[in-house]
Amino acid sequence: MGMPVNDTIITKNIIKVSESYLMPLYKKLCELIRSEEVIHMDETPFQVLEEHKANCYFWATKTTAEFSRHPINVFHYANTRSGKVIKDIVGSNYQGIIMCDGYSGYSNHLYPNAKFGSCLVHIRREFINIIKALHNRPAKSSIAQQAVSLLRPLFHMEKHLKYHTKEEKAAERRKRLKPLLDSFYDYISQVKRPLGKLRNAIQNAIALKLRVYRIFENGQVPLTNNPVEQAIRPSTLIRKNSLFAKSIRGAQASAVYYTIVGTAKMNHLNIYKYFKYLFDHLPNRENKDIEGFLPWAKEVQAQCHI
């Protein structure tokens, strides 16, 4: 007869493992992402019964596909969507650029040393949605269609830029993309008395113009925040299946596991092999150095690469 195991025992041990063995690795990844010059950030709701409120949140942070030191994807649990959570993730004096959506929590008043970039794909999507919804109202649709048409060559041009460094990329963008983006903003700025969703789309695009133009300051800034939204997607699928976490410790443990799995995937590791490697070696490591267990470490790559 084996030891009886139930859901409660399994859950307690999953949490215990995250706190006792995986936390140093998690903290190291959190530390490293704070040193990145440009990062993606987004948040998604999650219910935690112990908090006695409708929504808590997982905040996701991800390094950029180009020019980052290492591929990292960090999840942070918080019981609020307040922009004050950002300081718990990257510190109150973060001086890099945070790619984000238009949510007011990403505030220069709260973080005067940081810069915020905005997702041009989100801006374009608002006009695309108008075209889909107002196909039988040609006046509004034609304005939205023209706005989308003005952005289309910009995305095409971005894919064909030639550069080796982020400085060269920024210079190429200023030369080739800026006239296209200027034309888009010139056009939507002269639209007279827009109404409804068209007005909202135009006002939002204009409000975020300074943040959109970050792409000309730093070539590492991407045009889109989609990568972090895609990184969040697995956690939303888990939310649909599990519905909620019972405890705060459970939610925090989830953030640890999401972080390690997400970062392992970005570094092309076999997830099962990586966790086995961690559990075989972490409990018996002779020193406090965690560097050798990071997903891009030489031995980890040798043992766990897909």
Model features per residue range: what roles?
Residues 1-306:
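Catalytic center-proximal scaffold of phosphoryl-transfer enzymes
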